[in-house]
Amino acid sequence: MSKSDLNLLVENIKFEHLSIFYDFILSVLNTLSISDFELSVILCDNVYIQKLNNKFRNKNEPTDVLSFNYNEVNEDLVDGINYKIQGDLIISFEYLKFSAQEFNVEIYEELQRVTIHGILHLMGYKHETNDFQKEGMLILQENILRKNKRVF
């Protein structure tokens, strides 16, 4: 029996588009053929994510997104990819303001991009570089974004 559980939380920031964001995440999961999931997404500020980044990665600095996968090693992998997600995504909305400026995109587009990125990592996808032209995971990420992009 498959589970579908998506929780959105907001820590130390204002975010008024939870319903649009919620629908976006469900659409991405559907595009990826994921119907069995327990996923929590926390939108936060730089202080919140920096504490977690320091605690779990020994990097005392903020970052855009952290993925925490709670899946046990299982036999449900298809070519190394897990279609059953159990984990948390922590996203610094404050950090995304800087990334969006750097990449010359709207902040909500960047939010959607890093959300997809985190979900792909929870599935087991990896990338060695940030080359959007050559890295399979990043090409997939951009294709999913094009198919599911929302206006906030």
UniProtKB/Swiss-Prot annotation:
It comes from Borreliella afzelii (strain PKo). PANTHER family: ENDORIBONUCLEASE YBEY, CHLOROPLASTIC (PTHR46986:SF1). Keywords: Cytoplasm, Endonuclease, Hydrolase, Metal-binding, Nuclease, Ribosome biogenesis, rRNA processing, Zinc. Belongs to the endoribonuclease YbeY family. This is Endoribonuclease YbeY. One of its GO terms (cellular component) is cytoplasm. One of its GO terms (biological process) is rRNA processing. Its main location: cytoplasm. Its EC number is 3.1.-.-.
